[in-house]
Amino acid sequence: MATEAFVKPVVPNGHDGYEDEDEDDIPLVFKRNSNTAATTNRPSPINNAMRNSAIGSTKSSPPMRSPLTSPNRSASSSTRSSMMKPALPSSSSVQRSTLKSPLRDDRSVVAKERNGFGKAPSVSKSDDEDSEDDKPLSARLKLDSKEVTKQPSSSGRGSTQQAVQKSNMRPQGLSDYTKKKVLDERAPMSSTVQTKTSVGTSSSKPVHIEQKRPLVNNIDRNGLKPKTEGHSSQAPAKRPLEKGSSSNQSSVKRPKLSEPARPVKVEQGSHISATQDAKGKNLDASKPLRANQATVKEDNSDGDDHVPIASRMKSDSSNNKSSSAKPSSSKMIASSSRTIAQKPNKWVKDSKYSKSSKSLPSGDGQKKWKTLQHNGVIFPPPYKRHGVKILFQGKPVDLTPEQEEVATMFAVMRETEYYKKPKFRENFWNDWRKLLGKNHMIKSLDDCDFTPIYEWYMQEKETKKQMTAEEKRIVKEEKLKQEEKYMWAVLDGVRERIGNFRVEPPGLFRGRGEHPKMGKLKKRIRPCDITINIGKEAPIPECPIPGERWKEVKHDNTVTWLAFWSDPINPKEFKYVFLAASSSLKGQSDKEKYEKARKLHNHIGSIRAAYTKDFNNKDVTKRQIAVATYLIDKLALRAGNEKDDDEADTVGCCTLKVGNVECIPPNKLKFDFLGKDSIQYVNTVEVEPLVYKAIGQFQAGKSKTDDLFDELDTSKLNTHLKELMAGLTAKVFRTYNASITLDLMLSKETRDGDVPEKVVVYQQANKEVAIICNHQRTVSKSHGAQVEKLAVKIEELREQIKELNIDLDRAKKGRTPLMGSDGKRKRNLTPEALEKKIMQTQGKIEKMERDMQTKEDMKTVALGTSKINYMDPRITVAWCKRHDVPIEKIFNKSLLAKFAWAMDVDPEFRFCSSTDE
């Protein structure tokens, strides 16, 4: 897990300078809720006459209904019940019933069904027959099992033969299909319940019909199976669909389950397990279970990271062939993945994760969860005073703890570029002066010397570096112990990891580029600033700071955030606590995002034809919408929003100024503006002649500071995009263009070769996507040193090759090698060994030259953003499988957990293949 005590505050168009932390170092542990309720249905006592008249309605009650029951069963059962007489309770009636007419058989079947789960009538009953109605079904099942066993029989097969004969009795005058349907309806309900509940249940454990079990599989997002609470159960992908009944069940039911398995029976068993929810209610079989969608292959060891996914899949498939009765895990995963691609489950719409927003989150009306429990957030430790004084005009100055804390924030930034920026210093002084007060002796920031505090800070930093490994381990364990309970939430009975559970510490805002608020003080967030969202039945998290309380506690299950507070720099924005990127909700949201982008592929032709047609539209608004849509499609521009005066002056498509676009004849446009996060966007592109003409018309008669699209704003553009396709936004265009570019380039450029060469092909494709999305970064300070170091190593290897060639010539002539450059005598090698060594050294040189070129090409390109947010991970996984590239060469540990849902994709997956409309 992360060792940094702070979480990076995320602010649009700005950041606070803290580095991103890896929040997913600890494997996910999913545990089922052990407090399952095993409820026993107790029928109310009624007399025999009333039972015969109420058989149809009794069988249709939800707790007793089998998923295999025909829709017409209630009607047919009530019709038959009107013709029947009460069944005799004697033991002889059980034996004679198999020799009577079909009508007699109907009566015996109804008598069986009236007694509960299709159990046989007991041999003898007491006079007070209604007294057994007060007993639990499980007790009556045990009693009947004992009584049936005591029946006179020449062998133990007597009861078995009776049950088989009863199940084979068919009413006359019915078609084959109807006979088969009736036989399925008359199957003992206990066998159906056993087939359903035996999955994942120990055979020595009594079966509870309404045992609550979360639908989400307890599968670690890194692909490892966690430990489960309570009794161990079978692995979900390896469970047989049919199993022998529990030892506590009646032996009369055994023949039904011991009959040879038929294809129909297997399908029914699968249907039962797939269409029952945690309470035994029927679900729509057409909707895939989200638990199985994110299932990852279980690894038996940690040492196979170097093995390509395709090879691991082959190994799994060969192992699965050993058992014909157990369905293949890989096939089940693949089928569920294909189902998801065709009809994604709309489980969650909120795709924001640890981001700021200008509006309070509102749900879409759909319930995202049933139960939610967590422990709130963890606050940074209170400030500890160090007592080091700053100098004002050469004299030491005493400061209060609050004043000293802010002064220290400024002093530690002495070696950064912000320290000398006028805007940064101005904003800092304005906020610090308020804490100093009007009568304080410090009157000017320029007369202050923060060197003493900076030197103290560097000493503390050096002291931490000198700590032993044991001391660092103790500190890390203590930090983990304090944070452990805040890392996890329980969502619908499943333990999920929380993403940003730390409240950001106070500090000085930095921002990106020339942000107008850089240097302003970010005040300390307190519990009274935070709103908690939690389940109604869950205990409210205890406030960690004594004497304080939460601002508000909500129970809104239509949203996915756990807590939020106002941003201390931009009060109009809010910061949220969400589940981690590897959680089931976030994974489902990512999957829906990429499926929506794939859906755009089916509409892109008509959309492009529509906006091309409107390039000549007489309506200026429609013409501007058409040109803006063209730019968003071709250049992957963001839509853009109006900015306040105190916000960074960044630009999107709708907010372009006349001065941001230059027309270069005959049909080129040069764009130059500040994009998101104040990153400069400079690009010269060739456009359609009609677009070039329209841009010139939009610029006519305007100054450089006027809006280029004066008749258009973001709301109008978004409304138009949603008319073209449901849910279409500028971000969907960016996701589509990024993913399809990656897919096409990987398919076109990949050639046979070793893994490093294929990785370079992937990085080049990733670079093209990053350029399209304008994902840039500043050149690293260590870039020059790294390249120089590689160049020195390459030169050393070339000198080695020269020496090896000399030794090779001498070896061929039978001479001993010369002395080495270090003055030592070399080994006397054969010419073959020397040639092999030369080839190996040449390979090292080629690899280093390739690495050096890659570093040079990627020095200003940020590959991570597009990989995390815009490129469909299934493209990468499928490519790795097709070309035997270990996925660990492309995705780091955090991305492997985030994209666990994509790991079972088919190797032939293509992003541009057709999807459902």
Swiss-Prot record:
Family under the similarity heading: Belongs to the type IB topoisomerase family.
Start and end residues of each stretch annotated as Disordered: 1-368
Biased composition (Polar residues): 32-63, 89-100, 150-170, 189-205
Subcellular location: Nucleus
Composition bias type Low complexity, residue spans: 66-82, 316-338
Catalytic activity, reaction form: ATP-independent breakage of single-stranded DNA, followed by passage and rejoining
Name of this chain's protein: DNA topoisomerase 1 beta
Site (Interaction with DNA) location in chain: 464, 512, 561, 593, 650, 676, 718, 775, 793
EC nos: 5.6.2.1
Keywords: Coiled coil, DNA-binding, Isomerase, Nucleus, Phosphoprotein, Topoisomerase
Gene Ontology annotations of biological process type: DNA topological change
Pfam families: Topo_C_assoc, Topoisom_I, Topoisom_I_N
SMART domains, per the entry: TOPEUc
Source species: Arabidopsis thaliana
GO cellular component terms given for this protein: chromosome; nucleus
Annotated function: Releases the supercoiling and torsional tension of DNA introduced during the DNA replication and transcription by transiently cleaving and rejoining one strand of the DNA duplex. Introduces a single-strand break via transesterification at a target site in duplex DNA. The scissile phosphodiester is attacked by the catalytic tyrosine of the enzyme, resulting in the formation of a DNA-(3'-phosphotyrosyl)-enzyme intermediate and the expulsion of a 5'-OH DNA strand. The free DNA strand then rotates around the intact phosphodiester bond on the opposing strand, thus removing DNA supercoils.
Bias kind Basic and acidic residues: ranges: 102-116, 134-149, 177-187, 256-265, 296-307
Record keyword Metal-binding present: no
CDD domains attached to this UniProt entry: Topo_IB_C (cd00659)
